[in-house]
Amino acid sequence: MTNDPFSTDERRALAALTADFTAKEIAPNLNDWEDAELIPREVHKALGDAGLLGIGYAEEVGGSGGDSIDVTVLTESLLGAGASGGAFASLFSHGIAIPHMIDAANRRQVAGDDVGADWLLDENIRPVLAGDKIAALGVTEPDGGSDVVHLRTRAIPDGDDWIINGAKTYITSGVRADLFVVATHTPHSGSSRVSLFAVDTSLPGFEVT
């Protein structure tokens, strides 16, 4: 007889916590959120306080630990308790944004750039996993969809800064996000490579329409 990796004490507790949270805080409010076309930010904070936003992310970056099986348990429990696919995608949009930032922070640490790594971790990654900020991934564009080879968004160096020009569309959490991971081309990347920039949505020139 083999052990079921999905049925450990810890994962049963995670499933119960997730199902209870969903039944109390998400499922009863879905129709109201649909009518308002917005999920309150307080729900993100509550998920962060419960440790659910951090499942699958290492504790040293502000996560709750766990692996892909824990993420699967979380997802199945949340949807099984009545959350819609749209609510799940919106509440966990960081799942397609934060991994890129963690990778960048790790690379900066290896390169000896502790300032850059600390900025990514302390100003972006940890606040998102705590539910204090909302993150989104900006790839899809109005004309070319998600064809990254033909991205029209460009990032041009300007002294110590970068100027980004372009438009994104159909971005999950796009109207609520505090930070974007934006896919661009740069003068050095060419069309075969994509450069990702962490962009604070409060910066001048950033608009949501």
Predicted feature locations:
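Intrinsic disorder at enzyme termini
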Residues: M1-R12, A155
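A non-catalytic, amphipathic alpha-helix used as a structural packing/dimerization or gating element
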Residues: E10-K24
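Internal helix-loop-helix
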Residues: D49-D122, R126, A130-G131, S173-R176
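A short, Trp-centered hydrophobic/proline-enriched beta-strand micro-motif
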Residues: G131-V139
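Cytochrome P450 C-terminal beta-domain/meander region
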Residues: D147-N165
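A short core secondary-structure module
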Residues: N165-E207
